[in-house]
């Protein structure tokens, strides 16, 4: 029987460091076959439609998120499959919404295009976020 663990809602860089330590302590030494992040790796407030709400940059989010994923990966077995199901906050960075990031810049600021941190993101199988036509509150 295969073993897996799943978490969600890291919201880097505003995550709780004590929660991260607890997670890493509990993952270390496990014999997991799969580790799944169920969305919201990024806080995405740096790409918010609400002006001046971000206390950090998009680059700060990428740096923090990349390190978080690297820390998780470092305590898991080498054969463990890593899956990241994108959430609504992750999707907000790439949303087709000119109030967030202008369309011509969107590909340039994608986390997989950010050379400094993309190596870690690309180690994880990324499953796109699919918005419901009914909306998330229905």
Regions found by a protein language model. Give the residues of each.
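Active-site-proximal beta-strand elements of phosphoester/diester hydrolases
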Residues: 2-12, 134-138
């Amino acid at each position: 029987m295969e073993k897996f663990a799943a978490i969600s809602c890291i919201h880097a860089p505003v995550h709780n460091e004590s929660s991260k330590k607890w997670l890493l302590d509990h993952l270390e030494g496990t014999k997991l076959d799969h580790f799944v992040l169920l969305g919201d790796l990024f806080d995405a407030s740096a790409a918010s439609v609400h002006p001046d709400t971000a206390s950090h940059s998009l680059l700060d989010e990428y740096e923090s998120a990349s390190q978080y994923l690297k820390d998780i990966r470092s305590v898991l077995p080498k054969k463990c499959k890593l899956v990241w199901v994108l959430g609504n906050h992750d999707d907000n960075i790439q949303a087709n919404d000119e109030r967030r990031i202008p369309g011509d810049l969107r590909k340039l600021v994608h986390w997989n295009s950010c050379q400094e941190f993309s190596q870690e993101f690309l180690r994880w199988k990324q499953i796109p976020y699919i918005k419901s036509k009914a909306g998330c509150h229905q």
